[in-house]
Amino acid sequence: MLRQVLRRSLSDSRRPLRSVGSISCSARASGIGMRAYSSQIFKEGMQLETHTDIQSAAREQAQERMGSEALASNNSVLKHAYQESVDHGTRPIYLDMQATTPTDPRVVDTMLKFYTGLYGNPHSNTHSYGWETSQEVEKARKNVADVIKADPKEIIFTSGATESNNMALKGVARFYKKRKNHIITTRTEHKCVLEAARSMKDEGFDVTFLNVNEDGLVSLEELEQAIRPETSLVSVMSVNNEIGVVQPIKEIGAICRRHKVFFHSDAAQAYGKIPIDVDEMNIDLLSISSHKIYGPKGIGALYVRRRPRVRMEPLLSGGGQERGFRSGTLPPPLVVGLGHAAKLMVEEYEYDSAHVRRLSDRLLKGLLSIEQTTLNGSADHRYPGCVNVSFAFVEGESLLMALRDIALSSGSACTSASLEPSYVLHAIGRDDALAHSSIRFGIGRFTTEAEVDYVIKAITERVEFLRELSPLWEMYKDGIDLNTIEWSGH
């Protein structure tokens, strides 16, 4: 099967890297393979190489800088992991799918011709170069719309979900500000939504930030009570990027429609991964990200309902492209890449969903078998590809350092540069200790069963090792109730 070949190619972390001067997408074929694409034939046994000399140099520098410390460790597990991931030049297992996904080689293949022969400006309507690229852009627009059962005319291409979210919140709020100046969102939204909402407060808007329960779900009753006559917009994300909780989008949409309030949802983590029907769910605006669905980075979209029409004030001034909402020349390679990625999400939805759920169940069962581990967020209303677990008595950052052979994100930071506990985990009632001990695992199309088994084994060993260094773990094992201890500060 082609997807099995692609999965082995993209996620085989045991494969050594070869240094090349530039990024290459070369296939070495052996055995049998039958499916052809426009510029490459993918066959059984192909290997995809996507590294550069820069990565090789960075790896060598990391080895020089950290090698002595890592090799000095008496712990064989950590040393073995370090040596495999650095000394022998193998890539870590990638389980950070909520941050980004690998670009599907079939998507890359579709994009290539737009960097060579089909390089026309899609907005040039006086010659064939513009006509042909415009035609391909509109095909991509239809593919993007089909995922959410929308009209292609309702899809506005943007640079990504951050721009889409800002466009939705700021554009709607500013257009209706003379009659309505109230916005509702939740405390667990993505940073770009929270910051956009806060910037609206600086402009004089009133913003309500709704709490969520311990499962990470918003209360429908509290939402309805928060709506006022002057409320213009409600923004609630479909799937949370940290804990994978799926909000009751259909019910929220019904409430908003009943009160004649526009409903926006950040679907960066949901688009193509859970069923979405914008009409059935009464969604008026929906943000889309390409690189979360195995498409290229730097492109996204915003669904904007036409009936009843949603009006927005544009963020950018210019030539009035994209129905006047988003001026600027579209990048055909990226747009077509997003379109093909969306098409694949539809075609392979059943397979991908079953694959992700099976591996997620396997991973979660293995992780929760470790003593004193907790799943963060709802167990029932959750996208399976996002698994967030707290390991008590272990610092999440320390665990990540011990897992150099696995690419993961810590649930203890809302951004990679921050050392503050996750605001999402705080919102669902986790204390600082548990928030700091959380790790997010992302499973996707190219994740393999062997990788999941390796991760379970590695996590189990290294959590045990780090806990042996913790005095609190020793006290817990001795039966001491840590909640009864009065800690003194100095």
From Swiss-Prot:
Residue sites binding [2Fe-2S] cluster per the record: C414
Cofactor(s) demanded: pyridoxal 5'-phosphate
Name used for this protein in its record: Cysteine desulfurase, mitochondrial
Native source species: Eremothecium gossypii (strain ATCC 10895 / CBS 109.51 / FGSC 9923 / NRRL Y-1056)
Active site: C414
Positions of post-translational N6-(pyridoxal phosphate)lysine modification: K292
EC number(s) reported in the record: 2.8.1.7
Catalytic activity: (sulfur carrier)-H + L-cysteine = (sulfur carrier)-SH + L-alanine
Main function: Catalyzes the removal of elemental sulfur from cysteine to produce alanine. It supplies the inorganic sulfur for iron-sulfur (Fe-S) clusters. Plays a role in both tRNA-processing and mitochondrial metabolism. Involved in the 2-thio-modification of both 5-carboxymethylaminomethyl-2-thiouridine in mitochondrial tRNAs and 5-methoxycarbonylmethyl-2-thiouridine (mcm5s2U) in cytoplasmic tRNAs.
Listed GO MF terms: cysteine desulfurase activity; iron-sulfur cluster binding; metal ion binding; pyridoxal phosphate binding
Protein family membership: Belongs to the class-V pyridoxal-phosphate-dependent aminotransferase family. NifS/IscS subfamily.
Enzyme class: transferase
